[in-house]
Design a protein with these regions (language model features):
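Helix-rich, typically C-terminal accessory recognition domains appended to large enzymatic cores
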Residues: 206-243, 250-302
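Structured secondary-structure scaffolds
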Residues: 10-231, 273-277
């Protein structure tokens, strides 16, 4: 029960007071799919990530599923229930079905359906239950495969505070992108916190991350190498030489980092994938310092 009792009233997580009403409704027999959902998740432990969210969902299912109301009579808008226009479909029924209809369903032989289903869903943690309990049960009832994975990401706070209109701390994405750049903001969001966790957003954190990683590390390395090659090698790279021990060590590490990168990306662990990139950049900076090609120019012009 997510309701909070305050001053004799029940308050929803959103802060709104809960009003109890009665209305006629159609129900989906969600309870009949409890065991099958448990079996599916036990056999597919990577189908919900991060792991903490998987455990959360499985615990919820095991606690007992109740049948789900899937129609409303108090709404004047919505998709009518077949054969009973007094009812409209519960919004999450038609919203979730968009994943299928947008790729050609009910034509399961369409190219888009074959290419894109089952799909990877990346959703906010607040709508995880809809995507990992109700949605797969609907699909199983329709004899369709559940999503290949549901990844639940966290929320951002603004300098430690929840982002809301009432607090006046909503972040204007256009302003931020205009100031720092689109790819830079994407990089910050993925690099700053593990994808799936909550994170704190601040302009100071953006500046520190961009300066440390992109300017001082990546940017400095590219500038050092490219300016040297342009100045001393007529902007050409030659490969007619034998690798020394340091070359082989860096090449071996590059392969290792690339394999780790692919592994982490396949599990949406984007922060870990980026960490591999910057570990390799650090190793490359050390390699360049040790090789000191600016000194080699004086002793070996070739």
């Amino acid at each position: 029960n997510e309701l909070i009792k305050k001053d004799g009233k029940f308050i929803a997580p959103s802060g709104a007071e809960v009003e109890w009403i009665k209305e006629e409704s159609y129900f989906f027999k969600l309870s009949e799919w409890q065991d099958r959902l448990i079996d599916f998740y036990n056999n597919n432990p990577k189908s919900i990530l991060p792991e903490s969210r998987f455990n959360e969902v499985l615990s919820f299912i095991k606690s007992g599923l109740k049948d789900l109301s899937v129609s409303r009579t108090t709404f004047k808008w919505g998709i009518p229930v077949p054969n009973n226009p007094k009812h409209v479909m519960y919004v999450w029924i038609d919203a979730l079905c968009n994943y299928l209809t947008s790729i050609g369903y009910p034509d399961e032989n369409s190219a888009n359906f074959k290419n894109y289903w089952p799909a990877l869903h990346i959703v906010g943690k607040d709508i995880l239950r809809f995507h990992s309990v109700y949605w797969p049960a609907f699909l199983m009832a329709a004899d369709l495969e559940p999503p290949s994975r549901v990844f639940a990401h966290g929320w951002w706070t603004n300098e430690g505070e929840k982002i809301s209109k009432s607090l006046g701390n909503v972040i204007d994405p256009y302003e931020i992108v205009s100031k720092y750049g689109l790819d830079q903001i994407r990089f910050f969001l993925f690099r700053e916190v593990p994808f799936g966790n909550d994170g704190d957003f601040s302009k100071e954190a953006i500046a520190q991350r961009l300066n440390a990683d992109l300017s001082n590390n990546y940017g400095n390395l590219v500038q050092r190498i490219c300016s040297f090659v342009k100045k001393n090698c007529d902007s050409k790279i030659f490969n007619n030489f034998d690798n020394n021990e340091d070359d082989n060590i860096l090449l071996k590490s590059s392969i290792k980092r690339l394999n780790n990168y692919k592994k982490y990306m396949s599990n949406q662990e984007i922060d870990k994938a980026l960490k591999e990139v910057f570990l390799l950049l650090n190793e490359t900076n050390i390699y360049v310092d040790k090789q000191a090609p600016w000194n080699l120019k004086k002793t070996n012009t070739e």
